[in-house]
Regions:
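Charge-dense, helix-prone N-terminal extensions
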Residues: 1-109
Length: 109
């Protein structure tokens, strides 16, 4: 399997900077992208997969759906549209807004 290049992840994070709150974390050679504390996208094999939401689907219009990795649920595969900083920042913002808040971690007693 290929992994994602850090340079590609840094480029995407820069493209998404308009959201004001992008973070990413390396997981198994790939990256999870966070916006406002929610996982909004995965970057696998240098491809961007945005979590599917109704609002994101409406914004994209006719998204390409594909699993980020074998066995995963489908995500929205974003191919060249991330070259447009305003567009990708808006999609990430919409996705973060539409996703449920992260579940608080149960404290072990």
């Amino acid at each position: 399997t290929m992994a994602t290049d850090l340079e590609f992840m840094e480029f995407l994070a820069d493209q998404m900077a308009g959201t004001g709150e992008i973070a990413y974390r390396k997981m198994f050679g790939e990256y999870a992208v966070y916006c406002g504390g929610k996982v909004v996208a995965l970057v696998c094999d240098n491809r961007l997969f945005v979590k599917p939401t109704a609002a994101g689907r409406a914004f994209i219009g006719a998204p390409v759906e594909a699993p980020a990795y074998p066995g995963a649920k489908n995500s929205f595969l974003i191919e060249d549209a991330f070259e447009d900083r305003e567009w990708i920042s808006e999609l990430i913002r919409i996705t973060a807004r539409d996703l449920p808040a992260p579940k608080p971690k149960k404290s072990k007693r």
